[in-house]
Amino acid sequence: PEKETGNDVLYTSELAIGYDHPLSVVSLDLKRGEKLGILGGNGLGKSTFLKTIVGKIPALSGEYRFGTNVQIGYFDQQMAMYTSNKTVLDDFWDEYPNLTETEARNALGAFLFSGDDVFKNVNMLSGGEKVRLALCKILKTRPNVLVLDEPTNHMDIVGKETLESMLKDYKGTL
């Protein structure tokens, strides 16, 4: 992360999440540097909770607030369905046009896009490759809080191991 958050990162109190009726009510106090995993079966509201705290859907009731200097990097599991007629390199450059080719290729290389992989058409990538591209773009913003909704769903073992290593080294809140 480029900038550190305050000690308090996320506070929720009786936060009711859902679409028509509450799926769950969540109270938590997440501090800087903590890593929180949300576990549970399908339909219990894990993704709904994450979408609520990043402002994609409204809370049904209760409150939530972020602390000082929080910069969120959000990965939605739907990013594995991303489409683009551009190459991996050009798609990445669209978001970071000031990078040199070497800088862009180095960033992509950290997510296993090496050599001619950067010239693949995004539409031809597997779900796992699209996830890696999305994570590369997100992490390039240097967020100090990562909100990841099932990032390993479409990844092969090498992709999962690479992500695991990066998350272990990540200095922000997760």
Where are these regions (language model features)?
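ABC ATP-binding cassette signature C-motif
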Residues: E4-L174
